[in-house]
Amino acid sequence: MRSMKLSALLMGGIILFWGCGPKILLPPRVDLRPYGTLGMIELSSNAQGNLAPYTSQKILHSIQDAQPGTLVMELGTLQNALGSVGRSELDYEAIKAHGSKYGVGGIIMGNLEIDKVKPSINIASTLATINVSAYVEAFLSAKLVETKSGATVWSNGAQGRENVASVSLMGGEPVFNATDPDKAYGQLVQHLVGYLCNDFRSYYK
């Protein structure tokens, strides 16, 4: 019995030793340096207002925080980006044209989908528009496309559900127009962007 206890203690000590051993800092899963300057198209979204532009800026900040020195050229909305190269859709020719015109090696683009907006207060059916606090479900997806080949070299997605403020419902569609986005829906966006951009950060193993 005593020998069994000693064996158990010894095994526990070995596990504890390895668990508390030094961790190794590994490079990001996605290294952006080979692409030189990146282009970034503002997120498309089914939500009106400033949520998509706000989230796009948070993605930009997260990328440059993870890999300082990364150059990013903001190409505006999808409509503006297509118009700048005389294209009607974001196909290979449009991607290639952005690479030639702006000298970007890759373009980051994505979509922010808002679903199941559930107001936390009652809304009178006679009102067409009312500002509310609401629980929303959001799905953020993004990808990095190489301009030379048109191939997608990275993609990721994140999903979250939070109670956010300053949401308007117009015809049943969500509108986000907070004067202070950080306070109104910063927590939701921080969660989504943090998970989405994790591949750009160094990590311990």
Give names to the regions the model predicted.
Residues 1-20:
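Sec-dependent bacterial lipoprotein signal peptides
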Residues 12-15, 30, 99:
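Structural motif
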Residues 20-36, 101-102, 114-117, 132-205:
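C-terminal/domain-edge helix-coil "capping" segments
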Residues 37, 41-116, 145-147, 151-155, ...:
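N-terminal segment of the mature soluble domain
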Residues 91-92, 127, 178:
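Short alpha-helix boundary/capping motifs
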Residues 95-97, 125-131:
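Short, P/G- and charge-enriched loop/turn segments at secondary-structure junctions
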Residues 121-126, 169:
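Outer-membrane beta-barrel translocator domains and adjoining extracellular loop/strand segments
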